[in-house]
Amino acid sequence: MNIPLVVRRLGVQDYNQVWRQMQDFTDQRNENTPDEIWLVQHPPVFTQGQAGKPEHLLNPGAIPVVRSDRGGQITYHGPGQQIMYVLIDIKRGKAYGRDISVRQLVSALEQSVVKTLAGYGVNAYPKAEAPGVYVNTDGQEKKICSLGLRIRHGCSFHGLALNINMDLTPFHHINPCGYAGLEMCQLADFVENGEADCDEVSPKLVTHFAEILGYNATKF
């Protein structure tokens, strides 16, 4: 049985615009709508999740702040960060012989990042108590990927943000994901110049995600 997955490369687009498109897609889809992945980068923006607390926004400066409907706390998006939004019909999994829970979807996102980074020689890992993906460098734990999902009508939207080759300075203006003092890192910290490129990393990320969840008809 073919289990299709449509992958869309959106380039660099405004956060609010893509957010509205995700909501519209989720509201309008039906049981026959193929699942989709949207690969995108955003201009600089801070986003507050539904659990976001204002005290974690320390000094936004000129960077806009958006109150989002995803789960989680505050994070930063900017050019050089690969966003992968996953628009998945979770409840349809049983029809394909798969029982996908929200926790399994989160795990699939985390493991797709872990496997992708392993291909670059980076040893990364998830944490059960703090969703996302982390790297231990010289005894210090740093976060390289943040996660946030919303489930509506049994379908997911939002997804992950993997730091590839970006300006990490704005993360110092917040408590990332609600953790004071949490240091962020990116793929460019661990590889040679030129290897940390969103266009090179994103197909690997999608391939691992599709394999983990059993998609066998991925269309870019």
Curated annotation (Swiss-Prot):
The keyword RNA-binding does not apply. It is found in: Cytoplasm. Its main location: cytoplasm. The active site is at 177 (acyl-thioester intermediate). GO terms for cellular component: cytoplasm. The keyword Ion transport does not apply. Keywords: Acyltransferase, Cytoplasm, Transferase. Substrate binds at residues 70-77, 146-148, 159-161. Pfam families: LplA-B_cat (PF21948). Residues 31-217 form the BPL/LPL catalytic domain. It comes from the Bacteria. GO terms for molecular function: lipoyl(octanoyl) transferase activity. Its EC number is 2.3.1.181. It catalyses: octanoyl-[ACP] + L-lysyl-[protein] = N(6)-octanoyl-L-lysyl-[protein] + holo-[ACP] + H(+). GO terms for biological process: protein modification process. In the reaction, the free carboxyl group of octanoic acid is attached via an amide linkage to the epsilon-amino group of a specific lysine residue of lipoyl domains of lipoate-dependent enzymes. Belongs to the LipB family. This is Octanoyltransferase. It comes from Actinobacillus succinogenes (strain ATCC 55618 / DSM 22257 / CCUG 43843 / 130Z). The lineage of its organism: Bacteria, Pseudomonadati, Pseudomonadota, Gammaproteobacteria, Pasteurellales.
